[in-house]
Swiss-Prot record:
Binding site for FAD: 9-14, 42, 57-60, 257, 449, 454-456
EC number: 1.3.3.4
Family under the similarity heading: Belongs to the protoporphyrinogen/coproporphyrinogen oxidase family. Protoporphyrinogen oxidase subfamily.
Name the UniProt record assigns to this protein: Protoporphyrinogen oxidase
Task performed by this protein: Catalyzes the 6-electron oxidation of protoporphyrinogen-IX to form protoporphyrin-IX.
Organism of origin: Macaca fascicularis (Crab-eating macaque)
Membrane topology: Peripheral membrane protein
Assembly and binders: Monomer. Homodimer.
Catalytic activity annotation: protoporphyrinogen IX + 3 O2 = protoporphyrin IX + 3 H2O2
Associated pathway: Porphyrin-containing compound metabolism; protoporphyrin-IX biosynthesis; protoporphyrin-IX from protoporphyrinogen-IX: step 1/1
GO biological process: heme biosynthetic process; porphyrin-containing compound biosynthetic process; protoporphyrinogen IX biosynthetic process
Localization in the cell: Mitochondrion inner membrane
Length: 477
């Protein structure tokens, strides 16, 4: 009888792990267990009354690098090439990004000319920050906060405006708490290897071999900055589910895991609400803190390391306006914490993907709310109503983009604990977990956003790596 692998969590990481397991030459029996009634995790697309697409989670995927190429290969393998909506390199959504500082939108400088001239909100040309960076000595600490790293290498303005905003946009987090080593490993490694971040990024870390396909070649030739799918990004997990079913993977929905226990013969017993499963190996693609509460007593040191990986909530407010126009064209803008503690940024969805505007077309923007404002609200225990978030989002759209009319359509979703926080020393938590798993030879593999990347590409790759680890070899078609 063959091995049984149980995958916990039907988000994109668990789906990717199941996909690669199912494509092995001699695949194990795969059981995917999801606590909710739907697959896809935070990737969710909703169609509005006029046919417009609203993304409640991620809204675009970057094609860059080996990870971006692997995701495009997955898209092709699933037969979704014709559904891809690219943002090409010459498009405003690829070229223009903004910061909202001092009550005004400021375009982030691009190209050499942009770096050589003063660009508000920065008081001096960013060229000088780059020059300063080249002369700075290498840091001596094994880890550092993003703010400390950026201030030391690039100066206080870049740290408090650009990097603060970036941490809010990517992690909905605080740059004074997040780890440079874990959140931006390429910057950390560039300094370690080349003493200078800029030098390291210019010289690169050596070419990583990446897959090849017609879609990957097209993305490179047209310099795509991101892409989506015609019916929304949820088409990707939906296609994965269809594929898994065709490959004989058992998909259990609405089955939250209640506990994990080790049997005498070294197999897992996975306890569900009304039943249980036996597994030779478990891949956990659920949040680290959730897994920590399911582990048996003999794995207490592992549970302690995992429970220390926390996550923050984000309120996503999708707004659509009829007959409205944006003051600028671009991907969107970020807001530093010094400007507004609650508004993380606004994405101009209609600029990047006008094909999803519906009929009649309406201007779509998404306001992200979070940060210390939301954390304080959550801690206070007061009711977090949809009206509260809608009002806050409409006020931000009015003040920051001049969208003063009432939206024709609005969706509000509070995603509780949706983005893991790689705080200072995160790498040590991962090391503790790895050492425990290796020392005790536990048939458990960790995957998902809690560990080494929160972007969709990172999650898909973590699922693939988990499958490779279980199979002991690269799966093939």
């Amino acid at each position: 009888m063959g091995r049984t692998v149980v995958v916990l969590g039907g988000g994109i990481s668990g789906l990717a792990a199941s996909y690669h397991l199912s494509r092995a030459p001699c695949p194990p029996k795969v059981v995917l267990v999801e606590g909710s009634e739907r697959l896809g995790g935070w990737i969710r697309s909703v169609r509005g009354p006029n046919g417009a697409i609203f993304e409640l989670g991620p809204r675009g995927i970057r094609p860059a690098g080996a990870l971006g190429a692997r995701t495009l290969l997955l898209v092709s393998e699933l037969g979704l090439d014709s559904e891809v909506l690219p943002v090409r390199g010459d498009h405003p959504a690829a070229q223009n990004r903004f910061l909202y500082v001092g009550g005004a939108l400021h375009a982030l400088p691009t190209g050499l000319r942009g770096l050589l001239r003063p660009s508000p909100p920065f008081s001096k040309p960013l060229f000088w920050a780059g020059l300063r960076e080249l002369t700075k000595p290498r840091g001596k600490e094994p880890d550092e906060t993003v703010h400390s790293f950026a201030q030391r290498r690039l100066g206080p303005e870049v740290a408090s405006l650009a990097m603060d905003s970036l941490c809010r946009g990517v992690f909905a987090g605080n740059s004074r708490e997040l780890s440079i080593r874990s959140c931006f490993p390429s910057l950390f490694q560039a300094e370690q290897t080349h003493r200078s971040v800029l030098l390291g990024l210019l010289l690169g870390a050596g070419r990583t071999p990446q897959p090849d396909s017609a879609l990957i070649r097209q993305a490179l030739a047209e310099r795509w900055s991101q892409w989506s799918l015609r019916g929304g990004l949820e088409m990707l997990p939906q296609a994965l589910e269809t594929h898994l079913t065709s490959r004989g993977v058992s998909v259990l929905r609405g089955q939250p895991v209640c506990g994990l226990s080790l049997q005498a013969e070294g197999r897992w017993k996975v306890s569900l609400r009304d039943s249980s499963l036996e597994a030779d190996h478990v891949i956990s693609a659920i949040p680290a803190s959730v897994l920590s509460e399911l582990l048996p007593a003999e794995a207490a040191p592992l549970a302690r390391a995992l429970s220390a990986i926390t996550a923050v909530s984000v309120a996503v407010v999708n707004l659509q306006y009829q007959g409205a126009h944006l003051p600028v064209q671009g991907f969107g803008h970020l807001v530093p914490s010094s400007e507004d503690p609650g508004v993380l940024g606004i994405v101009y969805d209609s600029v990047a993907f006008p094909e999803q505007d519906g009929s009649p077309p309406g201007l779509r923007v998404t306001v992200m709310l979070g940060g210390s404002w939301l954390q304080t609200l959550e801690a206070s225990g007061c009711v977090l109503s949809q009206e509260l978030f809608q009002q806050r989002a409409q006020e931000a759209a009015a003040a920051q983009l001049g969208l003063k009319e009432l939206p024709s359509h609005c969706l509000v979703h509070l995603h509780k604990n949706c983005i893991p926080q790689y705080t200072l020393g995160h790498w040590q938590k991962l090391e503790s977990a790895r050492q425990f798993l290796a020392a005790h030879r536990l048939p458990l593999t960790l995957a998902g956003a809690s560990y080494e990347g929160v972007a969709v590409n990172d999650c898909i790759e973590s699922g693939r790596q988990a499958a490779v680890s279980v199979l002991g070899t690269e799966p093939n078609g």
